[in-house]
Structure formats: structure tokens, C-alpha cells
Swiss-Prot record:
Highest taxon above the source species: Bacteria
GO molecular function: GTP binding; GTPase activity; nickel cation binding
GO cellular component, one term: cytoplasm
Subcellular location: Cytoplasm
Descriptive protein name: Urease accessory protein UreG
Record HAMAP family: UreG (MF_01389)
InterPro entries per record: CobW/HypB/UreG_nucleotide-bd, P-loop_NTPase, UreG
Organism placement in taxonomy: Bacteria, Pseudomonadati, Pseudomonadota, Gammaproteobacteria, Oceanospirillales
Binding locations of GTP: G15, P16, V17, G18, S19, G20, K21, T22
CDD domains linked: UreG (cd05540)
Organism: Alcanivorax borkumensis (strain ATCC 700651 / DSM 11573 / NCIMB 13689 / SK2)
UniProt xrefs under PANTHER family: UREASE ACCESSORY PROTEIN G
Reported function: Facilitates the functional incorporation of the urease nickel metallocenter. This process requires GTP hydrolysis, probably effectuated by UreG.
């Protein structure tokens, strides 16, 4: 089936409530928007709060940020019945025609949440240090099967008594060779470069400047 628009890379960003998914998405958009054509789909159960936050933060032009009200379990909207999100991604792809990547942020969910492969080409799962040192070893598909695991809010480790060394060891044990990154996205951009590098490399993205040189 042929289309008159480019099929973008779709990157799913999941994780529990308050882990820093929206903060990560804002940083990614602001860091990548000059080099790539980007759009975003956010998910909330009863509101479009994350869409509003990203719009007010001027992460992208407002028309590039679409909010989906799932009206139910966040997991269902990204896995069992992803139709609303699939439609939102397709509408954005049709509207802009040349999108390189669409980020799909799930509503806050538990460690068992995963994206349908029909919806996401790559998945990033975000947990945070404030939830406790033991989180990585609890496992669950988000921690063990996501393409990239992000352990956010490392600046809070001393305040909550979390040992980052133990968290790193547990993460390596749970994920094997799968990549992961520590991050501090509130007051710093620690870890952001590694996350962007993962998206660009694994998603085989080509920047505007690279296209200009090769073209």
C-alpha cells in the first residue's frame, strides 16, 4: 500500500506516574527539533494535561502535539487496543508529510506496561530513583524488555537513601546486554545525550544537515 506521506519512526515512552516521562519528552523535543521533523502524541485518562504541559513549555509548535484521552486503563490504549494512538500518529503523518519521528507518551502505568509493536518501533521505559533502590530488580516487561531503560532523578538518590551502584548492578543483571541510562532531567540534562544517541542510531534517523550534504 502506497501513501503520499513519509512513515515516521514511532518511539513509545512509558513508565509509572511521576517518573519523568513528560520531562524527558520536553528535553528530547527541544534538543532534536532543529535536526529532525518531530511530532508528539500524549495519553491521559480523562484530560489532555501532558499535551498542555508540553505546549506551554514550547517543546514544539502546538499543532505538532496531540493529546489522546484514553478514558480507561493506560495499558490498554498502548497495547490491547491502540487504535486511538495509531489514528493520532497516522493523522500527524498525513498532516505534515515529512515527519522523521513521532514520540508516543503513555499514561502513567505499572511495571507490566508494554507498547504494541504495531504502535512503537522503539520503546523507552522511564523509572525514577525516588521510587526506591529496589525498583530495577522488581522486573516486569518495562524494565526487562524495553529497548532503552532510563533511571531518572538520580539527583534525589542521597535524599531517599538509594545507592546508584546497587541500582546499576541490578539493572545490568535484569537487562543483560540491553542498554540503559541514568538521567537527571529537572536541573540538568545528564543522560540526555545518550538517550538521543540511542533514538538516532537505533531508529536510523538522518538529520537535516546530513540530508543536505548527501543530497
Amino acid at each position: 500500500m502506497t501513501t503520499d506521506y513519509k512513515s515516521p519512526l514511532r518511539v513509545g515512552i512509558g513508565g509509572p506516574v511521576g517518573s519523568g516521562k513528560t520531562a524527558l519528552l520536553e528535553k528530547l523535543c527541544k534538543a532534536m527539533r532543529d535536526d529532525y521533523h518531530i511530532a508528539v502524541v500524549t495519553n491521559d485518562i480523562y484530560t489532555k494535561e501532558d499535551q498542555r504541559i508540553l505546549t506551554e513549555a514550547q517543546a514544539l509548535e502546538p499543532e505538532r502535539i496531540v493529546g489522546v484521552e484514553t478514558g480507561g486503563c493506560p495499558h490498554t490504549a498502548i497495547r490491547e487496543d491502540a487504535s486511538m494512538n495509531l489514528a493520532a500518529v497516522e493523522n500527524l503523518a498525513r498532516k505534515f508529510g515529512n515527519l522523521d519521528v513521532v514520540f508516543v507518551e503513555s499514561g502513567g502505568d505499572n511495571l507490566s506496561a508494554t507498547f504494541s509493536p504495531e504502535l512503537a518501533d522503539l520503546t523507552i521505559y522511564v523509572i525514577d530513583v525516588a521510587s526506591g533502590e529496589k525498583i530495577p530488580r522488581k522486573g516486569g516487561p518495562g524494565i526487562t524488555k524495553s529497548d532503552l531503560l532510563v533511571i531518572n532523578k538520580i539527583d534525589l538518590a542521597p535524599m531517599v537513601g538509594a545507592d546508584l551502584g546497587i541500582m546499576a548492578s541490578d539493572t545490568n543483571r535484569m537487562r543483560g546486554q540491553k542498554p540503559w541510562a541514568f538521567s537527571n532531567l529537572r536541573n540538568d540534562v545528564e543522560g540526555l545525550e545518550k538517550i538521543i544517541g540511542f533514538v538516532v542510531e537505533e531508529g536510523m534517523l538522518v538529520s537535516h544537515s546530513e540530508k543536505a550534504v548527501s543530497g
